[in-house]
């Protein structure tokens, strides 16, 4: 659906790339970089190969030492903790807000030690975390902030003084992903890093290209993480429509909300409207835990796609158990992981489709939860 509407523009730009033979670091990459800088109102954008690399490169640019501690959320996609461990750093994970599922800022300060260097908050499902509070904590403790903005590109954060700023441009560094399902998605993998620091931008531009600033002279330990010209061309077309795409997601979310407003046992996404414009990368419901799996089965039988984001917190994932996280530190995550279920959310959803999904949900009985399992 989305491709059909912009097919002629996308095909034209792809043909230009093929004709130019500039498949790596072609002029279109710089053009997209400039346009994204203008859209975000940020000084520097560094395109890269994917969102995971973006996080890793951001950490590499900060001259951290093995064993330095990085504070982040317990509830997100694996990339956030993965890159910390890959670089020999220590993840210190924090429980989440039960309403938004974002990192709970009130729990951060108690986790800070003399080894803490960075906070990585995630703007989950399209909604900004309480980044202003996190920046204050970071400034107070001389820490740096990397915003994981893979799921909220185009969202604006509203400060207490009513000023607005794009998520991903507020901390020292921001990162994003252009995975196809993202709000701004390419037709493969892609990512980008944002910063207002000239020094950090210079360093990261070297890191993404094997540590080179001049060909075959390697000044940094780097990686091979360049956004290819084909993906840049596609993203450059779609960037013009990002606000429209996000508006479409918001309208679909509103229709879902209306459909579920009289269903007591279904909690629609909580929106912190005083600080954020939710752009709904996911539309995630919260339901009684004993009902969630039967609801998922019901949707599956009726050929309605759904997602469980996420079935486990980082502290329970097999790959990270060597970090010896304590289960008792994550009461909210332990509860939420059994309650969340995400419904179809994309730019081409129709009223008819949303009504069908909502009507299908209404056909299954939601039993009264026990006292211990109440939301």
Describe every region a protein language model picked out.
Residues 1-22, 27, 302, 344:
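N-terminal "arm"/small-domain region of PLP-dependent enzymes with the aminotransferase-like
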Residues 12, 29-34, 39-43, 106, ...:
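PLP-dependent aminotransferase class I/II
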Residues 21-69, 83-87, 93-95:
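Phosphate-binding glycine-rich loop
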Residues 60-156:
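PLP-dependent aminotransferase-like
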Residues 82-84, 137, 166, 183, ...:
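Hydrophobic/aromatic ligand-binding patch that stacks against planar heteroaromatic rings
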Residues 147-185, 214-219:
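Conserved active-site segment immediately N-terminal to the catalytic lysine
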Residues 169-205, 212, 232:
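Active-site PLP attachment segment
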Residues 368-371, 375:
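Positively charged, low-complexity/disordered segments
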